[in-house]
Amino acid sequence: VNKSGGLIFYKNYSSDKNTLDINDTLRLASVWHSLHAISRTNSVSPVKKSSGIELLETSTFDLHCFETKTGIKFMVCSMKKAIGVERLLRRVYDVYADFAMKNPFYELEQPIQAELFEERVMIAVKSCRNANSGHYSGGGGGGGYASSLY
């Protein structure tokens, strides 16, 4: 999600048929961007200098967020209590820095359409899923880890 709340990358890694469609994903990203901005204000947050919402826990999934210093937000929708999601988000940020930001043809704040970026993100997701495969038993999130990244 870019600084304006626009979706610049989305990939669904779940084999589950009951996932959000692209329109719902756009709405979720937009709402999250707004809530994240509101939560950073001192009038709302009980914590001084709050960095905003980092985790939303629901009864069926968790939504994690990592915001970079440049304002780009990486979000992962995962199975409840997934382990190592923060590590995955930081790895995706590294991939973003290496394969989007260093790409002379990539325009900041625009959708990322780089095949190598997508391949490396997939490798990061698979690596984290493999590392966590023993912690979960089936259901949602396709293997118990990240089901969507945006």
Where would I find each of the regions flagged by the language model?
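Acidic, low-complexity cytosolic segments
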Residues: K3-Y150
